[in-house]
Amino acid sequence: MSFIPVEHIACSTAKLPSSRCPLLLLQPNGSSTKPVRWRSACNQCHAAKVRCSGERTGCDRCNNLQYQCVYAISRVGKVPGVRARGNKAVRTTTEALQRPATASTLPDADSTGEFQTDQRSENDPLSRSDFGEQDAAHDALSPKSHSALFPDWTEASDKSLNAYETADLFILPSQLMSSDQDPSRSRGHSLQAPSHSGHSIADSHTAAMPDGGLFCPFNKPTTPIPALPDLDLHIQDFHPMDVPVSPLDNGPPVKRRPYSDASCGHSGHSSKGYMSSTFPYSELLSQIGCQTDCGRQPHHYNYRSWTVLICNRIVEFLEHRIQGGVVALDVVMQTNKVTLGEISRILSKGAHKEGSNCAMLLLIAIDQIVTLFECGVKQGSPGDSDRASIGGRDLSALGDDLTGGNVLPNLRFGLFQINQDEQLALRSYLLQRELQRCLQVLTNLRDAIPLEPNPCTALEARVKKLCSAIADSH
């Protein structure tokens, strides 16, 4: 098999543009009295598995794509063996490189009729073996996409016909609520333990809060409270930022001045007067708020706003505990420790003195803590003889000598075993110590709540009554 160049067909006779590539026909070496049967589809259309128009002067697809339209010998009928086909393919490639193909021919009418009626060569698996390397080169040149087939038809705005782009599949639902004023978009937060190393303003601003973050005001539950999951948070979950906090030793807080700035909404001079000098990271928040609100109505999430969000989140956390029916004393004591630790951090910054909103929310949180203690002590009272547990664990399998209620099982120091009376006394001490912490918080909140009668008085009475009940029962 070899390339046999034939004469050009005049463009005027074929009525084709002069820019079209010449047609090549592949036929075997030597003369044969039997007429040659050609494929009904050119090699380009056959390799791309598309319908070929079948013009011997060049099919429509090759003319549109400026390809060289080549028709091969039809392999219908008796074919040579595997070894002969392999040798013939190598010889065909060598002769094609030595003898350039620059001419085309028009077959007679009889052979043309045979080409158009012959359809079996399209599905013949042996027909591509003779020209394996030729078809491989054509496959590399054949475009598969719509943009590559018709580059002039595509426009810059027609990027994709699919409305759901690949990147859109990974957009979280909270990101669809476009809110540039959301403080969660300007501060990074995660449910992992915070790293107290310093961060730059750029790093803090570009970090995005994941869905379900702690302080996102839009991530509020929409289902009824009993159906909400129990929030097992820790103290680090309440920190709104990872910036080190300095102690309250720089004098009284400075009152805020109204927002005013001619350029971008922020400057070094205005930042000093805008926020309190005792809250260094609140000034950072105001700077981020100015950067995100350039060109829009000023809306700042300052330190006071952040504090109210934190207090509201604490109240929500404790309400889930109450609605979830948490009565195990170990869980109640751990919840009290976590919550009071965060409340103490807020009080140390003096945030409850700047406005009554924060103080009232903290008072509600203390009331919820006392409610948890009352339910836990009532559930685990010594009079409940059929329940002997600590933290909700059944201790009936440990022995019949457990007459107390919510006691500490098998507590010892090395070989020294602590008896039941000592365990009850230890439990009483731990409960009273946690309640004394609530009394300390109420003492700090009393001056910040300008109400008469002060609601802290009634809550302190409840705490003292609960402490007396615990001491008398043990």
Swiss-Prot record:
Basic and acidic residues compositional bias: what residue ranges? 117-138
In Pfam terms, one family for this protein is Zn_clus
Presence of the UniProt keyword RNA-binding in the record: no
The residue ranges flagged as biased composition, category Polar residues, are 90-105
The GO molecular function terms of this record are: DNA-binding transcription factor activity, RNA polymerase II-specific; sequence-specific DNA binding; zinc ion binding
SMART domains referenced in this protein's UniProt entry, alphabetically = GAL4
A single GO cellular-component term from the record reads: nucleus
Alphabetical GO biological process terms: positive regulation of transcription by RNA polymerase II
| Annotated CDD domains | GAL4
Q: Where in the cell is it found?
A: Nucleus
Give the annotated DNA-binding region, as residue ranges: 42-69
Q: Which residues does the annotated region (Disordered) include?
A: 85-148, 177-206
Q: Record's InterPro entries?
A: Stress_Response_Reg, Zn2-C6_fun-type_DNA-bd_sf, Zn2Cys6_DnaBD
Keywords of this entry: DNA-binding, Metal-binding, Nucleus, Transcription, Transcription regulation, Zinc
Q: What does this protein do?
A: Transcription factor that specifically regulates the gene cluster that mediates the biosynthesis of aspirochlorine (or antibiotic A30641), an unusual halogenated spiro compound with distinctive antifungal properties due to selective inhibition of protein biosynthesis, and which is also active against bacteria, viruses, and murine tumor cells.
Q: Quote the protein name from its UniProt record.
A: C6 finger domain transcription factor aclZ
Q: Which organism is it from?
A: Aspergillus oryzae (strain ATCC 42149 / RIB 40) (Yellow koji mold)
The gene is aclZ
